[in-house]
Every structure is written in C-alpha cells, then in structure tokens.
C-alpha cells in the first residue's frame, strides 16, 4: 500500500500534460522546443501556485520539425506518450537518442523516456534514465526536474510500514537532496512536504517494531526503537507515543529517573496529549511525578533538536 496516492497527479501537474501550450517562461521545457543548453539556475522553475493550477512547467508536447531527420522517430514516440502507450513511447525516445545522439532533440528524449517509464510504473527504469540525464547534462536547465523525477519514483514505491522500508529511506534521501540543491523552487517545496510524510513513515516503522518488542518483553530492544524516534524523527507525529513508551518501558525496568524524564519531556511539549495523561497516571501508581533529569539522554536529545 503506497502512502502517495496523489503523487502521480502532482508529477503530472509539474510536468504539465496540457496540450494547450504554456504561458510561462518555461514553455520550452522538454516539449515546447528543442534543447537550448544550460540555464545556469534552477530559479526559473514555476511557483507552487503554478504547479497547483497546472500551468507551470508545461510540456506543450512540441513536435520536431518534419524537415529534421529525427522528426519521424521523435514525433511517433510523442504520439505514443499522448495515447498512453508508455512502454512503446519510452522505447521510441531511447531510439531517438541511439540513432541521433547529436541531435538537439536527443537530450530531451532521455528525460522524456524517463517520464514515460515513470508513467508505466517502471520506476527503476525511470530512475536509471533520470540519473543518466543528470550524469550527461549536470548543468542543464531541466536537471532539477530529473532529480525530482528520481525522488518521486522512489516515493511512489513506499510501502506499508509492515514491509521493508529501504525504499522509503532512498526516497527521503532524494527528497532532501532536492531541497539542498534547488532551494526556493517549487520542486523544493513539494519535496519538503513529501519528506515530512516519508520521515513519519520511517518513524511509524520504528514504533511498529518497538511495540512488538515491548509485547514480547524484550524491553531493551524496545527502548532502542523508541529512542530512534526521539533522536531521528522527533518532529513526527509518533514522538508523543515514543515518549510514553519510554516512560512505560523504563518504569517496567525500574529505571525511574529515565521514566520520569520521558514523562516530563512529554508533558512539557504535549501537555494535552492522551499519551501524557497515561504517562502521568503510570508514574502516580508508583508515587512518582514527572521530573526531568538534565543528564538523561532523553533530555539531551530533545535539547539538541529543540534548544531553549
């Protein structure tokens, strides 16, 4: 089960599948005209508002001029893409590059092939093609989109937290890279939003495993999982429960100062949470109160992320 039900729509909006053309400065992107080389900046990307309206980064589905040798191959691949024959389209764009490697359309064909692979759910092939585009054309004006396509291809593959989450980690790495490489762009904004969900998913996996260990009375193993959430995924929705579980587990082990610290940090940051109410009640059964030990790893980990 994927967590990104709307991500395909988002990518289509970014890639601009309208046939009506594009009124933005990016009308030549991929489909509006032949390759013109580098842009020197990713700042020409559309605003997030444009992405939501579907008017930014419009493909335009520009065809190659019939007088060009590449025209027949490229335009046939483009036609297949428009009709939804994505596998055939990908092969057609690959053939454009193979037969006309020095054509101004060959560069664009690589990314069009990557997009076609993505649309047929061929995520690994889409990633490989986009990575190849980046390797061959690192300074191209469309390189930011190639990075975005890679990230979304990983993101689409995120599975239920009961499954292996290695692809989620790859998605998060790719999404974070976009934010670092292309800040202040619509790509970065969307990547940041998706990264929040990816981190929450990884935290959910840690909690799932931690609860299992707790149920099996493997308390130290459970603590390590909850500890990971507090240290690595502190800003996710799973943190209140992780702090409660630490209270519960340390209490069961008789490590009361850590149990009290976990409850105190929980109460200070989520005072209205049901998890805090449960933690407080648990401590009261032993005649204890939430008290933060500043030397506790919990206190130090929290201060490292939220100082002050």
Language model region names:
Residues 2-6, 13, 21-308:
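Acidic, polar-rich low-complexity tracts and alpha-helical solenoid repeat scaffolds
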